[in-house]
Amino acid sequence: MSRILTVIFLSPGWFVCPNSHVPTSEQAQKHPGTCVESDKFFNRLQFSYTASCAVNHRDITYMARRGAIYTTNIFLKETSFRMVAKVETEIDILGMREAGKCAASVLEMIGEHVQPGVTTDHLNQICHDFIVNELDCIPAPLNYGGGGGQMPFPKSICTSVNHVVCHGIPSPAKKLKNGDALNIDITVIKNGYHGDTSKMFFAGEASILAKRLSKITQECMYKGIELVKPGARLGDIGYAIQSHAEANRFSVVREFCGHGIAKVFHDEPQVLHYGRPGTGVVLEEGMSFTIEPIINAGKRNIKILPDQWTAVTKDHKLSAQWEHTLMVTKDGFEIFTLRQEEQ
């Protein structure tokens, strides 16, 4: 499940804000150097600490122009200061492996059920029952978020069809048609650890464009993963993903990003799917995060629908996404959510 990117607008361009939210005055006193929320203005555009929200990544989007905050649905409920999600003990590694294996098994199970005429709500129910009854896991998206006028996510999986970029809500009214491209995004909690992964499916016979977009998007994900090792930078990963997508005349959605993950669903760092080589956070052994590029067949511009969750392409052209959860190892990486077909 993607994290919405935290950005600050400073003319003439967009910049990533290293803070996920603006700390309160009380928090700032405990952590000198952070910016403070005061009467809806940043006191200083200086960021010394990385903050994260353990509740809802959509609640922590702040955009500023000339210091002023422009946003919707802000509702800070629970915050914690941490630099990055890390898997530091053998118990943590085993926990993440088990959670990742469970998440992958849901995608392996659901494939045969993706057929024309099936509703996305039916797919959700099949996945929910499998996650809860067969895997003894918790579906992390169910009732996730909420507050500040935004409803909690009402289903156990995300089903994003055709021009839906991400966070599509399963519905009994959404019946798959022949040729539909569908991303199913799964996040499970097993013994306190999260496994987060997604895959593209097709209902019936898909178009050549849909198949090509899905293939290139999966390649983008792997090109990013292949660069993961201690000493690499997140900008290297983003650049590799962006370069491959644009070389194939596709575009990268920039409003959503990968995220740190372990015992917290959405944690630091923010893993951008675009960027410049040699920039960004330096990877260290034990860091765990997702890489989950969203690639559009048309322009990268998106909008959020009135349900406050579903993101769609503005030009209504196709979008695709693939996702894995992985960890930085001593000499490379380990993917926790590999499926049988990938091994």
Feature locations, PLM:
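Short linear motifs in low-complexity or flexible loops
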Residues: 23-24, 34
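Active-site neighborhoods and metal-handling regions in enzymes and metal-associated proteins
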Residues: 49, 53, 57-343
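N-terminal start and proteolytic maturation junction detector
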Residues: 8, 28-30, 62-63
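Residue-level detector of structural "landmarks"
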Residues: 13, 18-21, 27
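Intrinsic low-complexity, disordered N-terminal segments enriched in polar/charged/small residues
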Residues: 2-6
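Cationic, low-complexity basic patches in intrinsically disordered or flexible, solvent-exposed regions
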Residues: 27, 31, 38-41, 47
